[in-house]
Amino acid sequence: MFLLDFQMELERIVLLSHLAPVYDDLFDKRNTPKERIVLLLREPSTQPDNDEELMFLMFYRPLFQKMNKKRSFLSCFLKLTDAQENSKKQLIANTSKEEIRKITEEKGGCSALLLFSLLDAELKNEKALYQLGACCQYMDDIFDWHDDSIANRKTIANGLNIAELKSFYSQALVETIDAFDKEF
């Protein structure tokens, strides 16, 4: 039984891994309205309007079918969709550093919760997992620093000098580790 459960979880992870870049393209390259993406998530039988939607649904439909916790999965995906929509503010010049931090935490935190929803395990410390996702998004922003700077996308990474970034990221890691330590 354990091996079968593991196999199903692995299949879901692989499907989401294929789905994620297509999902990003719906936002970033296609400028698909959030309402349309929500429709695709809520109603997987929706007919696609273009090749990106077709590819999205090719991965999403079997993933959704394989989900044991469909309601939790959909809830996480809808929260991530809100966070993705909110991240468009990163292209607005007067968006505050605090708002950028909040956007980054939401994207990363919701992504981590979505990934965990693929597993059949019970989540015992949502806050710690959310913080871990935020740290992962901070790292992603560090790796994407050059591309984000060229695109005029405001991130924590391109809004701080190196010393400030080290301090910020170190503090975020300590807070995340502390959140997990409280669980055990």
Where would I find each of the regions flagged by the language model?
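Divalent-cation-assisted or electrostatically stabilized phosphate/pyrophosphate-binding catalytic cores
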Residues: 35-62, 95-106, 150-182
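Amphipathic alpha-helical scaffolding segments
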Residues: 11-18, 31-42
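Short, intrinsically disordered, charge-balanced linker/junction segments flanking boundaries
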Residues: 1, 181-184
